[in-house]
């Protein structure tokens, strides 16, 4: 799984970096030629895109290193750190766009030949939609937090390019403040996306449990297994592509130790079939030593 995961995530990061670099060159020319503050906003965003995508590429390769003596659970948390760093970069670019938009709102400057900006923005929009579609496919296959963060960023780029097209159209008809107003709106939206991305990264670093639906699936697998009378103390978290799952099985007191071990192994394999690549730890408890009032809720 790790080999396929690494290959797909690396390709997504390389594709994002290459696309952002190409669009940066195009936007530099368009901004120099038209003077549009909305295109400047897109240009700054492309700079952030390049830095974020390169960071993703390096971090993903590091996170795929196998566990060692000092990192017994692997290096998957590096992905969450990359997503957190991205959110900081993006917040900085959003602040820059906001301040630039205010400046141009106070002192609007007519654009030179907005048609060039329209063509460039359409090209950027098409390229970004293609990239986001590829990233979405990779996320469905890998559940990579780093690629998901990158995808959220490029999804905001799609919105931004659409807003830029509208702003350029309005400026073409003489409403020059539209360019600055849309730059302000874009800055606010990018900041919102960055804060959401940062929140998800922090939750991962704090070992937030797996989603309720995934935990319920684990419970259903365990409690429906022959030889298992019940279960408690389910603990879950995720680090990079790896889910960590711990649970206590309740078994009849009369069940031989060897048979209890075999049942636990079967349950573990069933969980791994549903969640490949997971790290599963199962503890067997005799029913008589499990006080009902002392068990933690499995979905808490």
UniProtKB/Swiss-Prot annotation:
Biological-process GO terms, alphabetical: intracellular zinc ion homeostasis
Record localization: Cell inner membrane
Protein topology in the membrane: Multi-pass membrane protein
Transmembrane segments: 12-32, 39-59, 82-102, 114-134, 156-176, 178-198
Record-level GO cellular component terms: plasma membrane
Molecular function per GO: cadmium ion transmembrane transporter activity; ferrous iron transmembrane transporter activity; metal ion binding; zinc efflux antiporter activity
Domain of life: Bacteria
Keyword DNA-binding (UniProt): no
Residue stretches in coiled coil: none
Major subcellular location class: membrane
Reactions performed catalytically: Zn(2+)(in) + H(+)(out) = Zn(2+)(out) + H(+)(in); Cd(2+)(in) + H(+)(out) = Cd(2+)(out) + H(+)(in); Fe(2+)(in) + H(+)(out) = Fe(2+)(out) + H(+)(in)
Keywords carried by this UniProt record: Cell inner membrane, Cell membrane, Ion transport, Iron, Iron transport, Membrane, Metal-binding, Transmembrane, Transmembrane helix, Transport, Zinc, Zinc transport
Stored Pfam families: Cation_efflux, ZT_dimer
UniProt xrefs under InterPro entries: Cation_efflux (IPR002524), Cation_efflux_CTD (IPR027470), Cation_efflux_CTD_sf (IPR036837), Cation_efflux_FieF (IPR023783), Cation_efflux_TMD_sf (IPR027469), CDF_Transporter (IPR050291)
Residues bound to Zn(2+): 45, 49, 153, 157
Family assignment from sequence similarity: Belongs to the cation diffusion facilitator (CDF) transporter (TC 2.A.4) family. FieF subfamily.
Function: Divalent metal cation transporter which exports Zn(2+), Cd(2+) and possibly Fe(2+). May be involved in zinc and iron detoxification by efflux.
Subunit field text: Homodimer.
NCBIfam families the record matches: CDF (TIGR01297), PRK09509.1 (NF007064)
Protein name according to UniProt: Cation-efflux pump FieF
Biological classification of the source: Bacteria, Pseudomonadati, Pseudomonadota, Gammaproteobacteria, Enterobacterales
């Amino acid at each position: 799984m790790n080999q396929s995961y690494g290959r797909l995530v690396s390709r997504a990061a390389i594709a994002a970096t290459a696309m952002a670099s190409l669009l940066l060159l195009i936007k530099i020319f368009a901004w120099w030629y038209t003077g549009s503050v909305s295109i400047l906003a897109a240009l700054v965003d492309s700079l952030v895109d390049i830095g974020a995508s390169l960071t993703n590429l390096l971090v993903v390769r590091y996170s795929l290193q196998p566990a060692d003596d000092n990192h017994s659970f692997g290096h998957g948390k590096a992905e969450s750190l990359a997503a957190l760093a991205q959110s900081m970069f993006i917040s900085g670019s959003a602040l820059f766009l906001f301040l630039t938009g205010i400046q141009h709102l106070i002192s609007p400057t007519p654009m030179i030949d907005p048609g060039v900006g329209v063509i460039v923005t359409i090209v950027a929009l098409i390229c970004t939609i293609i990239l986001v579609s590829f990233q979405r496919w990779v996320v469905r296959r890998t559940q990579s937090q780093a690629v998901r963060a990158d995808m959220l960023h490029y999804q905001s780029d799609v919105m931004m390019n659409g807003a830029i097209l509208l702003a350029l159209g309005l400026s073409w008809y003489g409403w020059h403040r539209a360019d600055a107003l849309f730059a302000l709106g874009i800055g606010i939206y990018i900041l919102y996306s960055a804060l959401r991305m940062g929140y998800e990264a922090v939750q991962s670093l704090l070992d937030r449990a797996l989603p309720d639906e995934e935990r319920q699936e684990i419970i259903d697998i365990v409690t429906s297994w022959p030889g298992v009378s019940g279960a408690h103390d389910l603990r879950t978290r995720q680090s990079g592509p790896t889910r960590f799952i711990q649970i206590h099985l309740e078994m009849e007191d009369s069940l031989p130790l060897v048979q209890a071990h075999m049942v636990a192994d079967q349950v573990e394999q069933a969980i791994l079939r549903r969640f490949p690549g997971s790290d599963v730890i199962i503890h067997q408890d005799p029913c008589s030593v499990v006080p009902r009032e002392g068990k933690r809720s499995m979905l808490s």
